[in-house]
Amino acid sequence: ASAPRFKQFITEVTLGDVELAGFLQRSCGLALSADVTEHALWMHFGAGSNGKSTLLTILSELLGSYAGPAPVDMLLVKGRSKEAENQFASIAGKRLVTNVETDEGVRLSEATTKLLTGGDTVQARARYGQPWPLAPTWKLNIACNHKPLVRGTDSGIWRRIKLIPWLAKFEEGTANLSLMDELRAELPGI
């Protein structure tokens, strides 16, 4: 199956930037596998109405139960608690894990980001359950209008963060209101 509308969508959202389009398509392809050797957090950022949520939604629909949302604050700095292990349990078995719309000015937890992108087994626990070792299969994707703050300057965090700028703008009159249906029709080819 082919997906010409999906390819056109990628060209549109990257404003014809061939290198960015290729990078974006590779990140989509990686989301299909359980391979975590990339050790990455894909951070899609840019003002609204640019296609980033559309892409993550269509990939989530393509992957079905292999995709799911992360708790909104899972990757953010907050009081350290046992809740983190419960949050990790929510992404067990996922290939694509999405997190959308962080508030402006929030800080990314570098320790949690490194833990969840490092390829090592983490400890997870269902609420009131026993902890278990959880081998990573997920690719973390954040879609945000405002990039979370990152204080670290070491390569350990910055080599993991893959910044994907979304500069296109589809406003009233130029937005394709049937785009999701067009992309859904091509799911087998995507």
What are these regions (language model features)?
Residues 100, 141, 161:
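Hydrophobic, well-ordered secondary-structure elements that form the walls
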Residues 70-84, 111-131, 174-182:
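Substrate-gripping "pore-loop 1 plus following alpha2 helix"
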Residues 134-137, 153-190:
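Phosphate-sensing "switch" segment of ASCE/P-loop ATPases
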Residues 103-104, 145-150, 167-171:
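Conserved nucleotide-binding/hydrolysis micro-motifs of P-loop NTPases
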Residues 84-93, 124-143:
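AAA+/SF3 P-loop NTPase mechanochemical coupling elements
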Residues 55-58, 108-116, 156-160, 178, ...:
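Alpha-helical scaffold elements adjacent to nucleotide-binding pockets in ATP/GTP-utilizing enzyme cores
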Residues 94-117, 132, 150-157:
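Conserved AAA+/SF3 P-loop NTPase catalytic/coupling segment centered on the Walker-B
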Residues 1-93, 162-165:
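P-loop NTPase catalytic core of nucleic-acid-dependent motor ATPases
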